[in-house]
């Protein structure tokens, strides 16, 4: 029942793992260089793709997105990698900084359960998703970014531009708890 946190070399990847551990969610932080077979051997119920400085340093993350049929949550760079893997567009933001942002939750099912209609988050906007792929829908937006969060319409694949693992996102732990519930539900249905 373990969720693997894929370390994309971002400064907060260890905090993602610690946040999950604090919530008593079984987790392991693994490098983004593991092969598909090495990930499969760990038998995860879900993947969280952490943030990182660049797509070029994302290792095998895009392969994981394309290969695995388990719940996936992409955070910041992970969010952008999901968009890229499915054919969305990523580009430089108009505001290249970290900022406290109020997001508007437009779909509060599953990942945002219990959090609507608005949520204060800590978000990085150096790069962002400019257009979502086919078969995706927007879950949240803000005055800085049209795509703060999205999900696949048929798969348990989610992306968020912001960082739920930092204290600047006061209700970030609820995102992780909701994702764990998605993973457990999926595991029980398979």
UniProtKB/Swiss-Prot annotation:
Enzyme class, broadest EC rank: ligase
Domain Glutamine amidotransferase type-1: 2-189
Pathway info: Purine metabolism; GMP biosynthesis; GMP from XMP (L-Gln route): step 1/1
Catalytic activity: XMP + L-glutamine + ATP + H2O = GMP + L-glutamate + AMP + diphosphate + 2 H(+)
Entry annotation: catalytic residues: 76 (nucleophile), 163, 165
One GO MF term attached to the UniProt entry: GMP synthase activity
Name under which the protein is recorded: GMP synthase [glutamine-hydrolyzing] subunit A
């Amino acid at each position: 029942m373990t969720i693997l946190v894929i370390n994309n070399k971002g400064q907060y990847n260890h905090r993602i793992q610690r946040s999950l551990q604090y919530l008593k969610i079984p987790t392991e932080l693994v490098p983004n260089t593991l092969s598909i077979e090495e990930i499969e051997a760990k038998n995860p119920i879900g993947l969280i793709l952490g943030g990182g400085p660049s797509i070029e340093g994302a290792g095998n993350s895009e392969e994981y997105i394309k290969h695995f049929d388990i719940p996936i949550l992409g955070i910041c760079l992970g969010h952008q990698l999901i968009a890229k893997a499915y054919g969305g567009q990523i580009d430089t933001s108009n505001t290249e900084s970290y900022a406290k942002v109020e997001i508007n939750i437009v779909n509060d099912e599953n990942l945002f359960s219990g959090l609507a209609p608005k949520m204060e988050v800590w978000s990085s906007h150096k790069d962002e998703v400019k257009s979502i792929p086919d078969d995706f829908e927007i879950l949240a937006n803000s005055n800085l970014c049209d795509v703060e969060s999205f999900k696949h319409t048929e798969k348990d694949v989610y992306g968020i531009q912001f960082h739920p693992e930092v204290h600047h996102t006061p209700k970030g732990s609820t995102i992780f708890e909701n994702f764990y519930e998605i993973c457990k539900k999926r595991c029980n249905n398979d």
